[in-house]
């Protein structure tokens, strides 16, 4: 699930709705998210926050840790352009967050970039699963920043990093999902 601190939730939901071209059905706040989970009979929702700017990772993770209770289990986030992102991975683990969410389209990188190898290695060492927005995204419709074949590249170098390939492995790239990642025991 995606939710935001109260002070930015309305603005964030409007921006996401406008970019995607369809309405949102949540206020995007912690309180409304918990209400929806309860009303729908969902025991636990996994919060997947995103630091869209390098300067946001600490504050986003502080908020994620604050709401990491009851029916919300939180992941943390890092931004690969923040020079402290490896230290932030250690902090994510110490905060009790359950994994890491990255969104290459919003964060402006491609999964296959060599500069990310320390990230993958550290996540594997810390046993932090990584959730990735995969395939198409309306924010950058001409570029696919995270494709199933990129996960093969990552696992050749860091075979034991656990990856949750969101959107069934990649929006609008289903054939590549079957070809490249089905059956990999470290990709969910």
Model-predicted regions and their roles:
Residues 1-118, 122, 126, 175, ...:
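Mid-domain alpha/beta scaffold segments of enzyme catalytic cores
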Residues 98-99, 112-188:
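Catalytic pocket-lining loop regions of alpha/beta-barrel enzymes
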